[in-house]
Amino acid sequence: MSAVLARPDPTDAAARIRTLAREAGFQRCGITGIELGEDEAHLRSWLAEGLYGTMHWMAQHGDKRSRPQELVPGTLRVLSVGMDYGRKDDTEAWDTLHDGRRAYVARYALGRDYHKLMRNRLQKLAERIQAEVGPFGYRVFVDSAPVLERALARNAGLGWIGKHTCLIDRGGGSWFFLGEIYLDLPLPIDTPATAHCGTCTRCIDICPTQAIIAPHRLDARRCIAYLTIEHDGAIPEDMRKPIGNRIFGCDDCQLICPWNKFAQRTDEPDFRARNDLDVATLPQLFAWDEAEFLRRTEGSPIRRSGHERWLRNIAVGLGNAPGSEDVLAALESRRHDDSALVREHVGWALAQHGL
């Protein structure tokens, strides 16, 4: 008869899990329970106001998003982890934003898509935990299911939810990705993080489109990240000028946050900028045909936007750029593009230059 290994003491198991998480490449981790009552009420209110735009999946799945035990029956605890993606400094980001000919791509999207990388590491982490504590039920998530990941991360002690709705770690800023493992292990839980924004409103004040309509209240319909990534139609005209040269996402509310002076700079090779996206100009990127777009965005989160939206976004950026010869030539090259969506945005951009 084979021997049955006794489960380790829950406190010892939790400590070992944290060690394994850090060995797996996660710079922060914590364990929390599954109670999200206040966050459920906040989510319901946000949905009722229609602030989610066309992201209809936010309203799907009922209360499973805020009730882990309904999404994955048997769940008792959630292991929340964070992986840094901060770059060497913020100067380069501000320099790009202030140079109208250059294209600004949100920092998280400059390198490899984090979803697959983190999911693989979380899966391996779960397997290592099983090898040490014995079989248990679990499910891994990386922005891939209805999960209130920031609320869970806050409760697990990883940081607090800032007024811009991003998670902030007092000792590491906000430049990090989140992932979770739902567990059926009765582990001791960590202390939730407390807020330290105080009276600061820098993120609210700097938002180019005034999308942060109140502390902890984001109107996605005005958010540049939503407009350039999630929204699949025409960008509202009153939003186009404020978008500036931001062609995929926006980081302003994080760049201005004082806590990011403590942000940890990643040494993860997969998060390094690809295809010179951190220095590319708008005309250069506008010249990509669909085949080149697909080739250069392989393994990148940018691919999910599709070539048409990519061109739509860059057209807006070109409309806001200084009217140099190459900017105008780039726009003229797509005046008669096959896509009506692209043509409309190119027409708007040309009009900004008096053409």
Curated annotation (Swiss-Prot):
The active site is at 143 (proton donor). GO terms for biological process: queuosine biosynthetic process; tRNA modification. It comes from the Bacteria. Residues 185-217 form the 4Fe-4S ferredoxin-type domain. The keyword Iron-sulfur applies. InterPro entries: 4Fe4S_Fe-S-bd, 4Fe4S_Fe_S_CS, QueG, QueG_DUF1730. Keywords: 4Fe-4S, Cytoplasm, Iron, Iron-sulfur, Metal-binding, Oxidoreductase, Queuosine biosynthesis, tRNA processing. GO terms for cellular component: cytoplasm. Its main location: cytoplasm. [4Fe-4S] cluster 2 binds at residues 207, 223, 250, 253. PANTHER family: EPOXYQUEUOSINE REDUCTASE. This is Epoxyqueuosine reductase.
